[in-house]
Structure formats: C-alpha cells, structure tokens
Amino acid sequence: PAWAQDAALELAQARQAVDKATQADADQYAPDLIGLARQGLEQAQRAAGDRRERKNAPAMALRAAADADLARVRSEEATVTAQLQLRRNEVNQLQRQLSTGEDRR
C-alpha cells in the first residue's frame, strides 16, 4: 500500500535528520529537542511494525524529523554565536593593543 511506502520514506528521512542533528552537536546545544526527536523516531518505528498503528507512522516520523531539524538549527545557531563572540573578543583585544601602543616597533 501507498502508506507503507510513505512510512518507509518518512522513517528514512527522520533517521537522516536525527543523524544530521547529532553531527551538529545537538546533544550539547539542544539536548531536549534531539531527545524528543529520537523518542519520536523510536515511536514511529514501533508504529510502522504494529498493524494497528502502521498508518500513523508517517506522521510520527515527520514530527520526529521536524524536531531533529529544529535541534540541528538551534545547535548550528549556538555554534555560530559562540564563534562570533570569539571573533569580537579578538577584535577588542587587537583594538586595545593598538590603542596602548603594544607591538609597535
């Protein structure tokens, strides 16, 4: 049936989204969201194997993928914000060195 193909596709996409979020350090920067995504993926996988719940599996997998995508984006945002702060600190340090005459020859 078509819903079985949908479930397989949605489950694969959800697994991929969870993997991408994990690679983006979501466990560190968005632990609640990645946990929710993993839990949702497990529920979708169980539903896919249960005759009575099988039709719900695609929607459950979509939700898990959305949670994983959000976890990945939040993690990437935290990483970029940290890098930006590091660069600002470097600029401030260089400005202080220039204004105090350090490193002049």
Residues covered by each model-derived region:
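Long, charged/polar, soluble alpha-helical segments
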Residues: 2-105
